Amino acid sequence: MLHLLVTGSRTWDDAAYIWKILTQLYLNHGAIELHHGACPEGGADQHADDWGNAFAIQGAKVSVVPHPMDRNRLGKGAGPVRNTAMVKVIEGLLYKGKPVACHAFHRNNSRGTNDCAYKALVAGIPLVTHVWNGDAAIQTVHEEQLALFEAA
């Protein structure tokens, strides 16, 4: 089972692209535990959540683990605190020898996506970024972690 962290811009509106990436990961691994930030404004988190729930309903080995931020208690600092918590969950699985990865769907220079992706990279979690360039997404596997990603 792949333990996957999805982070992304709330303005990422290409659901089909995210569904394509997640479906390919599912086909490669046979099961996914999908963690995401549960952004209430939609975007990449919502597309990932929709994909996970749609596949789970059809009997696929997919579980969805949303990590909503506590904006009422933490105010503007809620996003980075939530990102740290999500990364720590995945990092813990990495240290237990579980296959893990982070896919970051980045658009409009999203600070939250940058924050979460950077924290994942520092934690040693294999990171793939998908950057929306206006017409299409460009996928980048971070070279220093390519061997880790291929092993996941």
Give residue spans per PLM region:
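Acidic/glycine-enriched connector segments
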Residues: 2-3, 11-150
